């Protein structure tokens, strides 16, 4: 029997780090260890809502679930049903958005024996049956934990659409060499969107990014400059008026707009900036079920503007993310700003918006406090990070895994 230490959700803002024995692996299941999990704002929302969250079971108070859905690890044992496809020793990542036909269940939200904030998990049959367990052959564990968030961005870009000229047929994806606007776009997901817009398969000719956080804007400006095919502008959100943004587009407006903050004023602003046949993607998931905002329906009718919303990617998006990352076309390491051990994951999850910065990377088998990359106390690890220009790296990860204190199972 396998013992695990895991962060479990019991109710609203009730996260508990506990050690317990996992049930024996069945013939249609897989036993695995988790090495890394990156914290997601969706987990903060989940922890705040508890059983009110649509993916969290009603009986979570008596049947707690393991939180965390952006994880990477190693397969330890494979049940007979899946031995033709998976083997012990393989690294894996999971597409948490299972898209089950009869229920909204997802790893990290709904299951008692699987989630990213754990040392060991039992992967249920549903994950493999939905083709949501993918092998990972990247150089690092931590980049495997960033596949899922990148897949969400890929899904959003794929969901946008425009009309085929002279018809009502939809051409999926952002407009090639069009004008793209990202509002509230310097958080970790926004940075991934910038990277994907610059280095993905379809690139805009103009990319404008706004945010009200000046340090985050400076970070984005430093790490994501213009490319030959894409001119990029970064604007302080306080100064990004409609007139200013419209002028940057040459008066044309924007073909694709992504809203990364659930804010009524931003949505209304975005609506007013859509070009004819433009598409607005509401990426940010609100907690308020009554959330709404005024939009321009005159333009919906006469200018063929479109509105979409996406919540996560699918397995195809995940495979695309894996391919981009393994080919090193998208540099997801740039979004990591903090590291922590499993012991600090609960407090950090509950306080996530206030922490600031980019992605917080949990090494689930280790015990150490939440640490910004610029404040690492270990001089050798700090020197490694400095050598990589402040970016988390394979070298840094290997050092941490070899030298950080192990989490205790007690």
Curated annotation (Swiss-Prot):
Q: Which UniProt keywords apply?
A: Metal-binding, NAD, Oxidoreductase, Zinc
**Cell wall biogenesis/degradation found in the keyword field:** no
Detail which positions bind Zn(2+): 40, 69-70
**The protein's required cofactors:** Zn(2+)
* Chain positions recorded as NAD(+) binding sites: 221, 309-310
Gene3D superfamilies of this UniProt entry? Medium-chain alcohol dehydrogenases, catalytic domain (3.90.180.10), NAD(P)-binding Rossmann-like Domain (3.40.50.720)
Q: What top-level class of enzyme does the UniProt entry assign?
A: oxidoreductase
| MF-aspect GO terms | metal ion binding; oxidoreductase activity
SUPFAM superfamilies reported for this sequence = GroES-like, NAD(P)-binding Rossmann-fold domains
Known Pfam families for this protein? ADH_N
Entry EC number(s): 1.1.1.-
Family of this protein: Belongs to the zinc-containing alcohol dehydrogenase family.
Tell me the function of this protein: Reduces L-sorbose 1-phosphate to D-glucitol 6-phosphate.
Q: What name does UniProt use for this protein?
A: L-sorbose 1-phosphate reductase
């Amino acid at each position: 029997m396998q013992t695990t230490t895991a962060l479990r959700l019991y109710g609203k803002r009730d996260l508990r780090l506990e050690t317990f024995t996992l049930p024996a692996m069945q013939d249609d299941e897989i036993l695995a260890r988790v090495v890394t999990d990156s914290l997601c704002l969706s987990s903060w929302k989940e922890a705040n809502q508890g059983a009110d969250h649509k993916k969290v079971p009603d009986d979570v108070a008596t049947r707690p679930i393991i939180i965390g859905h952006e994880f990477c690890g190693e397969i330890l044992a494979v049940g007979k049903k899946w031995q033709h496809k998976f083997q012990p020793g393989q690294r894996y990542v999971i597409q948490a958005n299972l898209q089950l036909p009869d229920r909204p269940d997802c790893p990290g939200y709904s299951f008692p024996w699987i989630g990213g904030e754990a040392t060991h998990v039992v992967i249920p049959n549903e994950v493999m049956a939905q083709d949501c367990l993918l092998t990972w052959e990247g150089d690092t564990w931590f980049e495997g934990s960033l596949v899922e968030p990148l897949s969400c961005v890929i899904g959003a870009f794929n969901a946008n659409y425009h009309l085929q000229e002279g018809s009502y047929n939809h051409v999926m994806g952002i407009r090639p060499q069009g004008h793209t606007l990202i509002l509230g776009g310097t958080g970790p997901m926004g940075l991934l969107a910038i990277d994907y817009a610059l280095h993905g398969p379809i690139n805009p000719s103009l990319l404008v990014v706004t945010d009200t956080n000046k340090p985050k804007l400076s970070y984005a400006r430093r790490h994501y400059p213009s490319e030959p095919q894409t001119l990029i502008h970064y604007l302080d959100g306080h100064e990004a008026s409609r007139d200013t943004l419209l002028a940057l587009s040459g008066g044309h407006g924007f073909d694709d707009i992504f809203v990364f903050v659930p804010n009524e004023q931003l949505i209304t602003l975005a609506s007013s900036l859509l070009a004819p046949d433009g598409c607005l993607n509401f990426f940010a998931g609100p907690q308020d079920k009554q959330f709404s905002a005024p939009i321009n329906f005159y333009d919906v009718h006469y200018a063929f503007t479109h509105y979409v919303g996406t919540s996560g990617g699918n397995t195809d998006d995940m495979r695309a993310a894996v391919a981009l990352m393994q080919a090193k076309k998208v540099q997801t390491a740039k979004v990591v700003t903090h590291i922590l051990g499993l012991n600090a994951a609960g407090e950090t999850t509950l306080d996530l918006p206030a922490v600031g910065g980019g992605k917080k990377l949990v090494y689930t088998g280790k015990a150490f406090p939440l640490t910004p990359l610029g404040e690492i106390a270990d001089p050798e690890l700090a020197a490694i990070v400095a050598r990589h220009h402040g970016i988390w790296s394979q070298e840094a990860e290997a050092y941490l895994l070899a030298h950080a204190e192990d989490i205790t199972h007690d």
